Amino acid sequence: MQIEMKDIHKTFGKNQVLSGVSFQLMPGEVHALMGENGAGKSTLMNILTGLHKADKGQISINGNETYFSNPKEAEQHGIAFIHQELNIWPEMTVLENLFIGKEISSKLGVLQTRKMKALAKEQFDKLSVSLSLDQEAGECSVGQQQMIEIAKALMTNAEVIIMDEPTAALTEREISKLFEVITALKKNGVSIVYISHRMEEIFAICDRITIMRDGKTVDTTNISETDFDEVVKKMVGRELTERYPKRTPSLGDKVFEVKNASVKGSFEDVSFYVRSGEIVGVSGLMGAGRTEMMRALFGVDRLDTGEIWIAGKKTAIKNPQEAVKKGLGFITENRKDEGLLLDTSIRENIALPNLSSFSPKGLIDHKREAEFVDLLIKRLTIKTASPETHARHLSGGNQQKVVIAKWIGIGPKVLILDEPTRGVDVGAKREIYTLMNELTERGVAIIMVSSELPEILGMSDRIIVVHEGRISGEIHAREATQERIMTLATGGR
Amino acid sequence: MKTEQLQTEQKRIHFDGVMQKLGPFLGLFILVIIVSILNPSFLEPLNILNLLRQVAINGLIAFGMTFVILTGGIDLSVGAILALSSALVAGMIVSGVDPVLAIILGCIIGAVLGMINGLLITKGKMAPFIATLATMTVFRGLTLVYTDGNPITGLGTNYGFQMFGRGYFLGIPVPAITMVLAFVILWVLLHKTPFGRRTYAIGGNEKAALISGIKVTRVKVMIYSLAGLLSALAGAILTSRLHSAQPTAGESYELDAIAAVVLGGTSLSGGRGRIVGTLIGVLIIGTLNNGLNLLGVSSFYQLVVKGIVILIAVLLDRKKSA
């Protein structure tokens, strides 16, 4: 299928989201669509699949002008959209998920399970997926759920699959599996639109790339004719001299130390420390137990055994309240789920852990609250019209900044950041890194969990590698390489 | 984002906010106009004062329910708490306890019953609907056991106690004054203190609230206790007004309270809503009851009309947010 979108314009209210975007997709190609958050990628794809209607512009498919009136119609014509938030019904079986809304039934309306199973099996075989059709989809890993979605798309005979951030929650192994599948699909003439922030993947899997900025197409080119720096430059419209801002660490005393900590079934015998002004990177494969570790250190879950030492004194953290009182902040990996009150103002979000500091007589001093919040909004350059804007309406990067702001407010001694730049665009990433560096200059100790190796290498002073719930190695930043970390992360020596 | 975009975004948010705040007021206003056109005596001061006295009981219960619903919970046991605490208060008075002291003890009993709800929901990890459905049944049963199914009468002639449900102060019914005082205190609690902010935060996103260091369990237990306390206070007013405790008092009061909260624009999924809205919701229900009585509509039809008004209000609210 060949798709041609020409001069697409779209406004939401008074917001001009797209102003003259052109996009072309050839049969059997993997086409990267890149741009910062808010550049208009999703809107463009939603126009293609009929969720939104363009104000102006042409869409032709195989040379014929075609406009879909809703995503279902697009799907029937062979264009499937796999969203970042997967459409999975966790309580239903894999089979039920595959045929949701497209169940095959006899004339009497009875489901023909055997027929559906055969079809599903055939599709899974083609993708070489080995998944039981009768297990609940919620029990599958995110990677497997993604495969369910792909299989679902292919069963509708999709010729074009749009994937929005498909690897955001996948393990390394699942990513390479996904790439195998994409390569196979390509051979069969299926085209893929690949939306991602991960530059390494774009260069690994894509044939062509279209870069968008502020609702316009900046460039479309063959991936072999461009490079990392050029893409970034076109995306942000300026040169990013270094991805990871430099800093000279001045390390102080151990502020936080954990000794022989274990939580049954998650991790075992974990010991490490972090000094003031230091960034300790925690690397490892997805599911190695890093997030569980951080949750237990912060008191969300209970430690079964082990000791926590803060500023040289043995202490206990039984719940998050105690952690906050002792100067710990926790930026969780899933900001929408655990970090933000989405339908609440930025002001109230930032104020939340800090309420007592401006409620001297038990009543909130609204003036002091406003000053406090304004200061943090400015300091973190959160882009918003007003502190009353709800968190939901912010871009990923700005949402993350709100979460960071609320913890900076408490004046933390130790900050735990779990995947601090997930789903954050390049420009905001850089701002978050700069902020982390500034915090360390003021003596804050940072523990950063990240699945992005370049980020671990670029930001950490020391790197701890976790493998299957145990610390498999500790490397000084100077001696660290991607290969060394991956070896430790996969259980090698 | 460009500044121009940001400004339109700001305007839109502002407009939505205003609509959300004004909706219930507008509803009440229109209702009052309709009722007073159909029967001008509705607006007579005596009737208005009467209305305020009538709504006090539902008001107190609904205020407590507002906090509960803001955390994303529900309390079906408020009517049963009212009945049980009323029976106990009446029993104490009959056996010679000073009535004022009895009312205070009754409120404490209400708070303890509410606390049981709170503990079941937090420590027992039960769904609020189920937990309070069960305690509602238990409290109702205990009331029947204690009263043996008969009203408790012979509450004496204590002046203070009689004033509480029937008296007037400066020409205003005492229950109305109690309700307004409770409203002011609770409004400050909800909008001006960290406790109120935390109430919203728990309803908005409980996990995020926990990670932000909020003592979720404690706040919730306190809120269910508050709901119990306010129910008991409403029960004392009812007991004083009827000069007796009825074994079946407060039946379906929980539903009127929930209706008032919802009419006031508070979201049943928690995190959004205002106590002023609840006050308006209480007045809307009160106006309906009072107005339909004035118009001589049979009590059977009154229920139908009340139900339809709730449906319309919620439908309009849906439209607005869509």
Swiss-Prot record, chain A:
Keywords: ATP-binding, Cell membrane, Membrane, Nucleotide-binding, Repeat, Sugar transport, Translocase, Transport
The keyword Translocase is annotated on this UniProt entry: yes
Family annotation (Pfam families): ABC_tran
Membrane topology classification: Peripheral membrane protein
GO CC entries: plasma membrane
Gene Ontology terms, MF aspect: ABC-type D-ribose transporter activity; ATP binding; ATP hydrolysis activity
Coiled coil: none
Domain ABC transporter span(s) in chain numbering: 3-239, 246-493
Reactions it catalyzes: D-ribose(out) + ATP + H2O = D-ribose(in) + ADP + phosphate + H(+)
EC number per UniProt: 7.5.2.7
Compartment(s): Cell membrane
Main location: membrane
Superkingdom field: Bacteria
UniProt keyword annotation of ATP-binding present: yes
Binding site for ATP: G35, E36, N37, G38, A39, G40, K41, S42
Complexes and interactors: The complex is composed of an ATP-binding protein (RbsA), two transmembrane proteins (RbsC) and a solute-binding protein (RbsB).
Family: Belongs to the ABC transporter superfamily. Ribose importer (TC 3.A.1.2.1) family.
Function description: Part of the ABC transporter complex RbsABC involved in ribose import. Responsible for energy coupling to the transport system.
Name used for this protein in its record: Ribose import ATP-binding protein RbsA
UniProtKB/Swiss-Prot annotation, chain B:
InterPro entries assigned: ABC_transp_permease (IPR001851)
Keywords annotated in UniProt: Cell membrane, Membrane, Sugar transport, Transmembrane, Transmembrane helix, Transport
Location in or out of the cell: Cell membrane
Recorded topology in the membrane: Multi-pass membrane protein
Keyword Transmembrane helix included in the entry's annotation: yes
Pfam families: BPD_transp_2 (PF02653)
Record has Hydrolase as a keyword: no
GO MF: transmembrane transporter activity
Its job: Part of the ABC transporter complex RbsABC involved in ribose import. Probably responsible for the translocation of the substrate across the membrane.
Subunit-structure text: The complex is composed of an ATP-binding protein (RbsA), two transmembrane proteins (RbsC) and a solute-binding protein (RbsB).
Protein name listed in UniProt: Ribose import permease protein RbsC
Lineage: Bacteria, Bacillati, Bacillota, Bacilli, Bacillales
Protein encoded by which gene: rbsC
